[in-house]
Amino acid sequence: KILVLNCGSSSIKYKLFDMTSKEVIAQGGIEKIGLKGSFLKLTLPNGEKKILEKDIPEHTVGVEFILNTLIHPEYGAIKSLDEINAVGHRMVHGGERFSESVLLNKEVLEAFTACNDLAPLHNPANLKGVNAVSAILPNIPQVGVFDTAFHQTMPDYAYMYAIPHELYEKYGVRRYGFHGTSHRYVSKRVCEFLGVNPVGQKIITCHIGNGGSIAAIKDGKCMDTTMGLTPLEGLMMGTRSGDIDAGAVTFIMEKEGLNTTGVSNLLNKKSGVLGVSGVSSDMRELDAACKAGNPKAILAEKMYYYRIKKYIGAYAAALGGVDIVLFTGGVGENQSLCREEVCKGLEFMGIEIDKSVNDKIHGDEAVISTPASKVKVVVIPTDEELLIASDTMDILKK
């Protein structure tokens, strides 16, 4: 059995897999670590949700709480912690050092720590998760699966920024991209689903959730992606601006008297759908506001879909054509309107959506293009945890 952990700055999500059947036998998450009112929310085997409140000052206490819950006589899923063969971690930023999943040891963790500058919120939290497991279960192998790894196949002309080269040499400033585990999972899964060989396929994967990114994939390898050095580049997101003129950033800093922390906060947490609409960062709430005729919400929605559409066109050019356009992520999987609006007007590229099929699809694997459509448009729900568990298993076998 494999335990998958995703440690954020104030949260830990977990899933326990039985790898013989690939089934999730326990799952849940801890929220508000280090804050008042921290709790663990778990899904019982019968699908019932349960909330356990507990003071969780830091990640080690959280991991311990999760492990104790897994063997709890009432809500547990296993009899003893010995049943866990390994732990797989979602690691956010692996820099240029990691292009595939690895067994975590001292040397690997030192190299990962060296990437902290690149993801100051996420990487230290990921490390806390690893250290917490080491403290409680010192003999269990742990595997790191990096969000940036899949994108390491991008060519240099796609990942370099047009800035003085020494900034790349000194600080590693370049495009890295994120959601890599999701893009890798869905691009592989869509080929299985359609019964095609990944070699020879040109695929554009759209991971649209609260954060959003698109990847251009050729022969199963990533050639380009919308997020950059940080997850702030590319699409318009729930609270992130996505692409913005760097000159506008310095202009705003000057006018508003903002320092780097202030401007980072503005662009990461107060912009995007929330900033434009003034309503919410949640697309469901935005939808409701649009239906109520709120002009700012309508503008935000138009901008949101337009950006996605524009990148699909750009990546079709970068790939020299496209065979499959894929939607995943919370919004991509569940909101048919988003898929419809993004694909509207792309008939010239051979993209034709079957509206009656599209309207019915919420979180299921499905082809939503018409039989006549030259490009297959497909919805594939992402399963990053399953891929992390599979990678962990593969590394264990080695």
Protein language model annotation of sequence segments:
Residues 298, 302-322, 332-398:
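Internal helix-turn-beta structural module
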Residues 69-84, 190-197, 312-323:
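Phosphate/pyrophosphate-binding loops at sites that engage ATP/ADP/AMP, CoA/4′-phosphopantetheine
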Residues 265, 272-276, 283-318:
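Adenine-nucleotide phosphate-binding core of ATP-dependent small-molecule kinases
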Residues 2, 11-57, 228:
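Short glycine-rich, Thr/Ser-proximal phosphate-binding strand/loop in the N-terminal lobe
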Residues 150-255:
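Glycine-rich phosphate-binding loop of actin/hexokinase-like ATP-binding domains
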Residues 70, 74-122, 143, 149-158:
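Short beta-strand-loop/turn "lid" adjacent to the catalytic site in phosphate-handling enzymes
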Residues 8, 89-92, 208, 322, ...:
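Glycine-rich beta-strand-to-loop/alpha-helix junction loops that act as flexible
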Residues 218, 224-256, 265, 329-360:
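Catalytic phosphate/nucleotide-handling subdomain of diverse soluble enzymes
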